[in-house]
Curated annotation (Swiss-Prot):
CN hydrolase domain boundaries: 247-515
Superkingdom in the source lineage: Bacteria
Stated name of the protein: Apolipoprotein N-acyltransferase
SUPFAM superfamilies: Carbon-nitrogen hydrolase
Length: 547
């Protein structure tokens, strides 16, 4: 019996091995693309930026590729690139969700399987159009690139990312053009370069034509880099300045959890921030304003709740510093019964040394699914009991600007809390409402020493370029930094260390609205027109060949 069991087991294992070996060979180009994309995104150098999707797209232009086969090839690519770039999902599920490691890894695999399905949908749709309208290989490549560009900005995802962000990460000056087309527009340009590289590959047997296209591609890329460099110079004008000191207390995850549960850690955390702020003021006595990260003050800070114990501790520590403070904290309406009402908000406050609210607090609007609210919990409240570790914050009405009056004039701070810095439309709203300086407060402690802190950092800094407003970023564990409207990134804090630093924030008073702020993602119209033209030309050529 044991011998029979061993024989059956070995036979099954061999069959499974042969099956996966065969599939791996079939999808070798899809696997290669997944690796290229995953290792060209933040925090890796963008070494394959303009050809990372090319192997996948060339594969689906082959005559033997069906819609079904193309979809699964795209699925393999998105699974691998997600596994590389978003491996931190498992760590976060374990730390934030307090799930066992086995369940956390399962959550990662599910995330990889379903989160970026727009990639296989784009290649499958491109294949269908190729078969339906008899598109050539080159036309199919550009069709897929344009479909991908449209889908990545409309497909519902938890974390919006694309290849445009690699430009600011790697300091390729083309990123300066984001104030014209946004980083989504730059991503579309990168995708078109991928299609162009694929076209060069398809024409490799025609050496002269392939080399001419490769040369033209290189010249076009160089021209865009040069244009970006020249365009960025226009934002070197400043007529305002404020000195902001950011305090990073490096509060651990368990301490944050205990503070949220109302334990003694609330006082410990408050005093730690005050002590670090006192030391920072001695080091930077010219500071105009202090900035603490998301929920750095782990209690309510509304004007009507300043008599609470921890608010009084905060006030007693702020008074000797004689500086206003921007900090994350919790907020609640005056009419709310704290014991019964659940409308607690994740908020951003601007207070004077006496704790007085200098403007109404900004309450977070773009809540993180499964982190700050549970989808469908309003319709099915029992879900909150099944998943008690998921927070249930109220939703604010942003974007909103906080006004700070100084002897030199008013400064308008445009607040972003955590992942709100990833939404271009949100920051456009802040610029439209007159924000002079953007301030992003966040807590990346849940992600450990993974890729996420660097990804989150540069995806947030990108908003400053789109709207051409300086941005100060205050985090609990790093990376805290600031970027000016001209793209200059100032000093950056270390990860997972106590730290404080002063940033001289130069800005332009009443700065003009950028083209992107005024018109948004206008380029989708161009993408649709070009897509229609490519498909239409392919269809006409096919008809003429038949006739």
């Amino acid at each position: 019996m044991d011998s029979l069991t061993l024989y059956v087991t070995n036979t099954m294992m061999k069959r499974w091995f042969q099956f996966f070996k065969h599939k791996a060979y079939d999808f070798r180009w899809a696997i290669l693309s997944g690796i290229l994309v995953g290792t060209s995104y933040i925090p890796f150098p963008p070494w394959a930026l303009i050809f990372c999707y090319t192997p996948l797209w060339i594969y689906v232009t082959e005559e033997s590729s069906s819609v079904k086969k193309s979809f699964w090839a795209g699925w393999v690519t998105q699974f691998i690139l997600t596994l590389i770039g978003f491996h931190w999902i498992a760590y976060t599920a374990h730390e934030f969700g307090q799930l066992p490691w086995a369940v956390s890894y399962l959550a990662l695999l599910l995330f990889c399987a379903f989160m970026h399905l727009y990639i296989p949908v784009a290649v499958a749709a491109g294949t269908w159009l190729r078969l339906r309208f008899k598109l050539s290989g080159g036309q199919t490549l550009f069709t897929i690139a344009l479909l991908h560009a449209l889908l990545e900005r409309t497909w519902p995802v938890i974390f919006e990312w694309h290849l445009g962000y690699t430009l600011i990460w790697s300091k390729i000056p083309m990123y300066h053009l984001a104030d014209l087309v946004g980083f989504h527009g730059l991503s579309a340009v990168v995708l078109l370069f991928n299609a162009w590289m694929g076209y060069v590959w398809l024409k490799q047997s025609f050496v002269k034509k392939a080399l001419s296209h490769l040369s033209l591609l290189a010249l076009t890329f160089a021209a865009l880099v040069g244009w970006g460099f020249w365009h960025g110079k226009a934002w070197n004008k400043f007529d305002g300045e404020t000195k902001a000191t950011v305090v990073q207390a490096n509060i651990g995850n368990l301490e944050k959890i205990y503070a949220e549960q109302g334990r003694a850690y609330q006082e410990v955390i408050t005093r730690k921030f005050l002590d670090l702020s006192f030391a920072a003021m001695q080091k930077y006595p010219q500071t105009d304003i202090l900035i603490w990260p998301e929920t750095a003050f782990p209690d309510y800070l509304d004007q009507h709740l300043l008599d609470r114990k921890h608010a009084q501790i905060l006030i007693s520590g702020l008074q000797p510093l004689s500086r206003p403070l921007i900090t994350g904290a919790y907020s609640k309406d005056p009419k709310a019964d704290e014991k019964q009402d659940t409308s607690t908000y994740n908020a951003l406050f601007l207070v004077d040394p006496l704790g007085n609210n200098l403007d109404k607090p900004y309450r977070k609007t773009e809540l993180l699914a499964f982190g700050e609210y549970l989808p469908l919990s309003e319709q099915f409240p029992f879900l909150l009991k099944l998943l008690p570790f998921v927070s249930n914050f109220g939703r604010g009405h942003g974007p909103e600007v906080m006004k700070w009056d100084t002897p030199q004039g008013s400064v308008r701070w445009g607040g972003q809390i955590c992942y709100e810095g990833l939404y271009p439309s949100f920051t456009r709203g802040l610029a439209e409402k007159g924000a002079d300086i953007l301030v992003n407060v966040t807590n990346d402690s849940w992600f450990g020493k993974t890729f996420e802190p660097q990804q989150h950092l540069y995806m947030t800094l990108a908003r400053a370029i789109e709207v051409r407003r300086p941005l100060v970023r205050s985090t609990n564990t790093g990376v805290s930094t600031a970027v000016l409207a001209n793209g200059d990134v100032l000093q950056k804090s270390p990860l997972h260390e106590e730290w404080s630093g002063q940033f001289v924030i130069k800005y332009l008073k009443n700065a003009p609205l950028t083209f992107f702020v005024q018109w948004g993602h206008w380029d989708w119209i161009v993408i649709l027109l070009v897509l229609g033209a490519v498909i239409g030309r392919g269809a006409l050529n096919a008809r003429s060949r038949r006739s």
